[in-house]
Amino acid sequence: NGHALLACQRQAEHLVDDNDTITLEPLGNMKPIKDLVVDFTPFWDKVNKVKPYLEPKEAPPEKERHQSPKEFLLIDDASTCIMCGACHSDCDVLEVDENFLGPAALAKAQRFVQDSRDGKTLERVKDLSKPGGIWDCTHCGECVERCPKPARPFDRIKEIMTVALEQGVTNNNGARHALSFAKSVKSSGRLNENIIPVESVGFFNFKGLFDLLPVGLRMFFKGKNPPILHKSIDEVEDVKRIYMELDE
């Protein structure tokens, strides 16, 4: 019925529409081979790109590597992924950009980015911050809706974003946008829509700023530019207070 579901988790009687019909289609964002069979090769290629294996900090010990319960909880949810492809099928970004790694691959990446035994965290988040990576996610949450397990890919993507910022991997539009967004809310309790686009591309990224010019001019002539001076908002200090409490 237009969404990816696991047949083993659904009762047919709950899926029939008003005409007592269930629509079956191949998984989305994958090339059909025959009937409902699709080619999973691009899916696995994306998973392999994130290096879904441990790259340890040190030589293998004589016994197993130890992890505390707290350390394991960071990767527990991602470990529940069964690679069913449901999130990949319904991803809106993959529908328009085949270079996007996709929610399944990025959820698998978080499994190793935050693994306390892995020694390549910085290298991983640098690779994942490139075009097609974490910052190309549109935050629609469709992957979470489709995921049949606690993996919740979008939550895993957000965790990689947090690690990337903590590691200082901020020289990209996505990270700059997130930092500008947070700075604006922290300082004024609202979004400064005039400065955020500029800070997102970078003050000294002249090509990026030039690319913004046509959009800015169209907005200006259509009267769509945000005002320079905003009207005051009642209790805006509460927004700043909430932000500060969450930021602690």
Question: Where in the sequence are the language-model features?
Answer:
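Ferredoxin-type iron-sulfur electron-transfer modules in oxidoreductases and energy-metabolism complexes
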Residues: I22-M30, K34-T80, G85-E248
